[in-house]
Amino acid sequence: MAAPPVTPSAHRRGQRRRRWPGYAAGAVVVLVIAAGVLIWAPWRPAPLLQPTGLKAGTATTSSVMFHWSDPASGPPPDKYQILSSGKLVGAVAGTVTSYRVGGLAPATAYQYRVAALRGGKRSPLSAVLTVNTATPPVSAARWQGHWSVNIKIVKGADALRGKGTKGWVESWHASPRCPTGPCTVQLTGDLNRHPITATLTRAGAVYTGKTKAKIFQCGKPADAVPIKATLTIQITLRGGQPSGHAWVASAWDGHMMIDSPYTSTSTFYCNAFSLTTSLSGSF
């Protein structure tokens, strides 16, 4: 009997599927290219995008607010960090795209950057945003500190004799009678080499007050007697500037009336006279 024909056993050639680390057998990694834009498959970690679109918002004399755009694609980050001068100043949840900073100085520029965080990783920092606190009115400035005061006689100088009768410079000090902000001021200093003290009340940017002081002498130096004059002072603040977190006066001017009464002794006398002076204060 003839032997049966011999035929090879049929075997299906197996297809080897490449397994990607971290994914189960049968999973397929897909990178779709649509209209030239790469779209990551949902099982791949979404890229952590740099925050963009920073814009200034509402500002007050002591605070600023700014905001930025949502991520262009993918989920929001876990949170955002806010930095100024390289230092962390705050953080918000990843669903929040605005931030307010308080306790700032008035009329001052500040710079901020934002970074996104997810899974312990941080995105590149955003572009720098410069924001400015609002400038208060001059009337809100606190008048304080030492001042160099330029005094010029604009009327009545003929009643005086000696050098410097047309004008001179004195040193005055303004001491507010409140812990912060503008208020009544005690003014101290010298006038014609004699001390003066005056209390000036405030009305907006204008301060007014009266005082008496012995600033002139009647008679020759050997037997002169003091003249007790009445000083009427009016000061108007002309500028302000930040000092720390306060808003303080940076310049002022005004005028002072000096009314000297008739003064006499048993051997001589001085007629009454009045002077009108201009005042200008600077640091």
Regions found by a protein language model. Give the residues of each.
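Hydrophobic single-pass membrane-targeting/anchoring helices
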Residues: 11-45
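Pro/Thr/Ser/Gly-rich low-complexity, intrinsically disordered linker/stalk tracts
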Residues: 42-76, 106, 121-136
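Short beta-strand elements bearing conserved aromatic residues within extracellular beta-rich modules
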Residues: 78-82
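Short S/T/G- and acidic-enriched coil/turn segments that sit immediately N-terminal to beta-strands
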Residues: 95-99
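Beta-strand-rich modules
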Residues: 101-121
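Tryptophan-anchored aromatic micro-motifs
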Residues: 138-164, 186-191, 207-211, 252-257
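Predominantly extracellular/secreted and cell-surface proteins with exposed
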Residues: 164-239
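Edge beta-strand at a domain terminus
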Residues: 253-283
